[in-house]
């Protein structure tokens, strides 16, 4: 077996350490205001993509909520039976809340979908 020179091993460890401690920039998801602005200025085809994104975000949250309900845990929100929203309905739900509460516009859109669902379908015990 070939031995790795100590200098190369030291260089690899140093490079890895630099990568771990160097500041990195992560791209967070759009906030509601930005997402709606991008949606509104998009072409017809791009709007359909955004509607899929918003609808799939809601769908994922709905599946997570279904698991909580099925396992008898506290649900995130309490929708009616056979609940389903389309992408355009999610867009309008976000738009309504953003226009009534300007602070809501600064919330990441994925989290905002959950908050809007909780507001629209609160759990009352």
Residue ranges and their predicted role:
Residues 1-6:
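N-terminal secretory signal peptides that target proteins for export/translocation
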Residues 92-125:
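Short, compact, well-ordered microdomains
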Residues 10-20:
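Bacterial N-terminal signal peptides
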């Amino acid at each position: 077996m070939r031995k790795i020179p100590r200098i190369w091993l030291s260089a690899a460890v140093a490079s890895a350490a630099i990568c771990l401690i160097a500041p990195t920039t992560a791209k967070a998801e759009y906030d509601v205001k930005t997402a709606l602005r991008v949606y509104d200025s998009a072409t017809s085809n791009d709007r359909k993509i955004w509607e899929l994104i918003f609808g799939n975000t809601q769908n994922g949250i709905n599946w997570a909520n279904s698991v909580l309900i099925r396992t008898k845990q506290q649900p995130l929100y309490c929708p009616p039976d056979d609940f389903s929203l389309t992408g355009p309905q999610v867009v309008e739900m976000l738009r309504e809340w953003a226009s009534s509460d300007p602070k809501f516009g600064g919330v990441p859109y994925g989290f905002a979908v959950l908050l809007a669902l909780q507001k629209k379908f609160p759990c009352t015990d």
